[in-house]
Design a protein with these regions (language model features):
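Single conserved hydrophobic/aromatic residue that forms the stacking wall/gate
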Residues: 1-12
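Residue "hotspots" at secondary-structure boundaries inside conserved domains
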Residues: 1, 235-236, 286
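Functionally critical, mid-to-C-terminal surface segments that flank or help form catalytic/ligand
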Residues: 201, 205-256, 269
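Helix-rich terminal scaffold detector
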Residues: 11-202, 258-344
């Protein structure tokens, strides 16, 4: 049910139409300040653009059956931070409420799945319980969460994902190489432009996916929002540490796995560790948790190999920025001030 739940929850992010990207050579060096605010950027765009980003939020959540043991809750039809806060907030309330018959919650970008036992609680009774909890949720704008920022060295346009793509083309079906396909689809200048855009923002970890530790993320800077469909059919293998995207979500593959995301980079940094060889895994075998942030930092093959050796001898130290207080209100304020005419 974990795989089914993850796929059902993430579907809303894979069919989002994207406006034409208008980005140029701009590198956003600063991200979040220590007090949780975002750096000021010159702007001639204010409230109207911010409201556009946060459209698509339903006045009331939609409750839909997912077979006889699952309930799907949809909070909207777009991928944005506010909807993820709603999903995470309700998930936390359900855990503390100890509702009889509820086994697990699977929050994602704009929706969540509740796994329950229909012998203990009926479908409509569960909906009534959840509606009651929703009334107790405070306004998202007042929510502040602890958020860790990880810097992940990444080789973009790398030889490993290129090999996987070429193997797929040779054995499965013809397709344009993934970086070129994403570049063309998003009307970017060239693959180097694509790399600048993708690496120009922090990514919000909205949920963990179909494999232990795999993060489903969304870009915090809307100017870096790209889109790409998943493979059809999927690949039979993907290199460990691959960075890829499907819909507008970016993910990191924790291991050598089948996969359907468009792929374009690779990181040597482990994101799950069953043996807990590194201190960051002392509380969990999975590195990330919802609310974390990832910054992909372009690196070359020499740096990749150096980090890989440190990982092998267990001397690698994660590039982790200590937790900050992340505020939706301050994030919205930052959105209202950025210049959407500037390009990466």
């Amino acid at each position: 049910y974990r795989l089914v739940g993850s796929e059902m929850c993430i579907r809303d992010s894979h069919n989002i139409s994207q406006p034409k990207l208008n980005v140029n050579k701009l590198s956003v060096k600063k991200h979040i300040n220590e007090d949780g605010s975002y750096p000021n950027l010159d702007s001639n765009v204010t409230k109207e653009k911010t409201l556009e980003i946060f459209q698509g939020i339903y006045p009331e959540p939609k409750f839909l059956p997912g077979g006889d043991k699952y309930l799907l809750i949809e909070f909207g039809n777009v991928m944005n931070l506010e909807l993820n806060f709603k999903a995470q907030g309700l998930s936390n309330l359900i855990k503390t409420a100890n509702i009889k018959g509820v086994y697990e919650t699977l929050p994602c970008f704009a929706s969540m799945i509740v796994h329950y036992n229909p012998d203990d609680i009926g479908y409509q009774d569960l909906i009534n319980e959840l509606k009651s909890l929703l009334k107790d949720m405070k306004d998202n704008d007042d929510t502040v969460v602890n958020s860790r920022l990880f810097h992940f060295p990444t080789v973009y346009l790398d030889k490993w994902t290129k090999e996987a793509i070429e193997d797929y083309i040779a054995k499965i079906t013809m397709k344009k190489p993934d970086p070129e396909f994403i570049t063309e689809l998003n009307q970017l200048d060239d693959v180097n432009h694509f790399v600048r855009v993708h690496s120009g923002t922090e990514y919000w970890v909205a949920s963990l996916g179909f494999w232990p530790g795999l993060p489903f993320t969304m870009p915090l800077d809307p100017r870096c929002k790209l889109t790409a469909p998943k493979y059809n059919p999927p690949r039979t293998w993907t290199p460990k540490g691959t960075v890829g995207m499907g819909g507008s979500s970016t993910a990191i593959y924790p291991d050598r796995l089948p996969g359907g995301y468009q792929i374009f980079g690779r990181t040597p940094v482990p994101i799950w560790d069953p043996d807990k060889n590194f201190d960051v895994f002392k509380d969990s075998i999975c590195l990330f948790k919802p609310g974390d942030r990832i910054k992909f930092v372009p690196c070359d093959y020499d740096e990749f190999e150096m980090i890989e050796k440190k990982v092998e001898d267990k001397s690698y130290r994660y590039d982790l920025i200590e937790e900050h207080k992340f505020s939706i209100k301050k994030y919205k304020n930052w959105l209202s001030k950025i210049d959407y005419n500037k390009k990466f």
